Curated annotation (Swiss-Prot):
It holds the Pfam family SAICAR_synt. One of its GO terms (cellular component) is cytosol. Belongs to the SAICAR synthetase family. Keywords: ATP-binding, Ligase, Nucleotide-binding, Purine biosynthesis. Coiled coil: none annotated. It catalyses: 5-amino-1-(5-phospho-D-ribosyl)imidazole-4-carboxylate + L-aspartate + ATP = (2S)-2-[5-amino-1-(5-phospho-beta-D-ribosyl)imidazole-4-carboxamido]succinate + ADP + phosphate + 2 H(+). This is Phosphoribosylaminoimidazole-succinocarboxamide synthase. The gene is purC. GO terms for molecular function: ATP binding; phosphoribosylaminoimidazolesuccinocarboxamide synthase activity. InterPro entries: SAICAR_synt/ADE2_N (IPR028923), SAICAR_synt_PurC (IPR033934), SAICAR_synthetase (IPR050089). Pathway: Purine metabolism; IMP biosynthesis via de novo pathway; 5-amino-1-(5-phospho-D-ribosyl)imidazole-4-carboxamide from 5-amino-1-(5-phospho-D-ribosyl)imidazole-4-carboxylate: step 1/2.
Length: 236
């Protein structure tokens, strides 16, 4: 019997038979801004398919990530990673906090993608944290911060091109990284997932919102939206 190690808002981690491997299961849960949890039937299956596909694509261009293989409709086998206590947010278009905090027009396109770091803590509501704080808190070394930024931008550039190819704009995405030790050396590795749960996706022509942004106002369209994204990616 699998031993549950951790349960988050939309995924559950279980132990695997081999050391340093885990099983990651995608659930149908979603959390609203109010903190209420809702179920979107079938969402976990679609996210497993989408994330598996995108992680495979990233592996092909040399991005080390924790994905090993898809086990079944909801589960995948992953490498154990010592996850950094930060999220890396990359934005190429004004949305969300850029509109609320800076008064920018939604949809304004930045000259270059902007990187933000947030503390990976729902309890503290994911506060923004800067590089100096990350360094002084001992969370990452200077070289690790540099490597994470370089990888994040490379990932974002690749995913943006891939989504444009299927008529979708990648407006923003949230990435997580960590360390995998190889003797005395460590490797920076992409972890978590890449799916409509952590990517802000819009129709490229109409700017119609897709994915998690529909949860609050049009929850009845969420599954249909995730399915559209999965179907478009099948074309690749």
């Amino acid at each position: 019997m699998k031993k549950k190690i951790y349960e988050g808002s939309s995924k559950i981690l279980y132990s695997a038979e081999e050391d340093f491997l885990l099983i990651m299961a995608f659930s149908d849960k979603a959390i609203l801004e109010t903190g209420e949890t809702v179920d979107i039937s079938g969402k976990g299956v679609l996210n497993n398919n989408i994330s598996s596909f995108l992680m495979d694509k990233l592996e092909m261009i040399g991005i080390e990530n924790h994905f090993i293989e898809k086990i079944n409709m909801r589960e995948q086998l992953i490498q154990y990673v010592e996850v950094f206590p930060i999220q890396v947010i990359i934005s190429s278009v004004a949305c969300s906090r850029f509109v609320k905090e800076f008064g920018m027009d939604e949809g304004y396109v930045f000259d270059k993608p902007i990187i933000d770091f947030k503390v990976r803590s729902r309890e503290f509501k994911y506060p923004i944290v800067n590089e100096y704080q990350i360094l002084n808190f001992g969370w990452l070394t200077r070289d690790e911060i540099k490597a994470v930024k370089e990888q994040a931008l490379r990932i974002y550039d690749f995913l943006s091109g891939l989504f444009i190819g299927v008529g979708i704009r990648l407006v923003e995405c949230k990435l997580e990284f960590g360390r995998v030790f190889n003797g005395e050396e460590s490797i920076i590795m992409l972890t978590d997932e890449i799916s409509p749960d952590n990517c802000r996706l819009w129709h490229i022509n109409s700017n119609e919102k897709l994915g998690f942004e529909l949860l609050e106002k049009e929850p009845n369209k969420v599954f249909e939206s995730y399915q559209l994204i999965a179907d478009r990616l099948k074309e690749k």
